[in-house]
Amino acid sequence: MWSEGRYDYDRLPRERVPPRSHPSDGYHRVVNVVPKRPPLLDKRPPLLDKRPPLLARPDEGGYSRYYSHVDCRVCDEGRSFSHDRRSGPSHSGDESGYRWLRDDHSTSRQPDYRDMRDGFRRKSFYSSHYSRDRSPHKRDAPFFRESPVGRKDSPHSRSGSSVSSRSYSPERSRTHSFHQSQHRKSSRVGASYKRQNEAIRGRGKERSIQSVKTSRDASPSSSSAVASSKALDKPSRLTEKELAEAESKWANETLEKSDESNLAEMNEFEAGSTAPLFIDQTEEPESNTVDGTELYEDSQLSNRSKAIASKTKEIEQVYRQDCETFGMVVKMLIEKDPSLEKSVQFALRQNLHEIGERCVEELKRFITEYDNSARDFGDPF
């Protein structure tokens, strides 16, 4: 019993030779035998059918199965992570298909193998986009339904490729083409919008020139303006030549309408030019009366000032004459008696002062009389 057990475990290192005798390129002959990874519920794994001939023992039933599994495990552990990544699709089935592992092996070795296999499957093969779905059918559906090539032609189905499944997913290529089409549409819309803005800017400049030329003319009727605006506000499908023709046509229409409106206004002005004249003639007396009163008042003031000036001149003349006469009399008296000079001069000054006061009183009296006569003369108005 113990010898057989030791014989079993001693045979392990020698049986590692056949799996390592494969070519140096890293390809295993079992790789990609199952291209679609169906659920392995009732099937025996294809690895057991391909076991080496040295492990076949007819006298021990569970020995060949055990050593076949050990051979598979040793091959997986002996090779690098790149080999496990390349041979990942052969182990990526549902865990219910590996019932023979639970039946024939110890519980201590089974979780290690399953964790190692699941870890390699999650890290290497599936992308983060497909790691949410646990069902292998849902994961495989996009590759077989939407991919234009088969699974053998896809770059990540080969064992030696370093292309990730995310970079080759048809969803990504589809979104890329969708973004390209959106970019083309946006560039097309931007070009048409730019052409439309340029056309509108050109129309605005031409309209400003036309408006400067025809600013004194009357505006055309609303119907022609609406029709011309509809013809000019078409989308940018019109070429620049058509826009120029439309602008010239609109300018001609506006000139014709403005000429017609000018003729109508001239006729109206000629027809109604007589009425405002009569109205102005009827309104003239009021303005003339207002101006007449102002002129009358001004004339009265000027006449009053003229009368006062003339009266002052008369009073001055009289005053000078009196002064001259008194001066001659005093001079004659002083010549006769020089001692009377001081007394005569004092009397002369008093007389001259009295004559001046009389002249001022006479001027005031004249002004009051003149104002009273002017007030009496202006009452009838």
UniProtKB/Swiss-Prot annotation:
Nuclear localization signal (motif): residue ranges: 117-123
GO cellular component assignments: chromosome; cytoplasm; nucleoplasm
A single GO BP: negative regulation of DNA-templated transcription
InterPro entries (UniProt xref): Pphln1
Loss of function: phenotype: Embryonic lethality. Embryos die during early embryogenesis.
Biased composition (Low complexity): 157-168, 217-230
Keywords: Acetylation, Chromosome, Cytoplasm, Isopeptide bond, Keratinization, Nucleus, Phosphoprotein, Repressor, Transcription, Transcription regulation, Ubl conjugation
Major location category of this protein: nucleus
Pfam family name, one: Periphilin_C
Stretch list, region Disordered: 1-65, 79-260
Tissue: Ubiquitously expressed. Strong expression in the developing somites and limbs, the embryonic nervous system and the adult brain.
Location of Phosphoserine modifications: 124, 128, 147, 154, 181, 211, 215, 219, 339
Biased composition (Basic and acidic residues): 1-28, 39-65, 79-121, 130-156, 195-208, 231-260
Compositionally biased intervals (Basic residues): 175-187
Crosslinked positions (Glycyl lysine isopeptide (Lys-Gly) (interchain with G-Cter in SUMO2)): 123, 194, 213, 241, 249, 342
Binding partners and assembly: Homodimer. Component of the HUSH complex; at least composed of TASOR, PPHLN1 and MPHOSPH8. Interacts with SIN3A and HDAC1. May interact with PPL.
Record's protein name: Periphilin-1
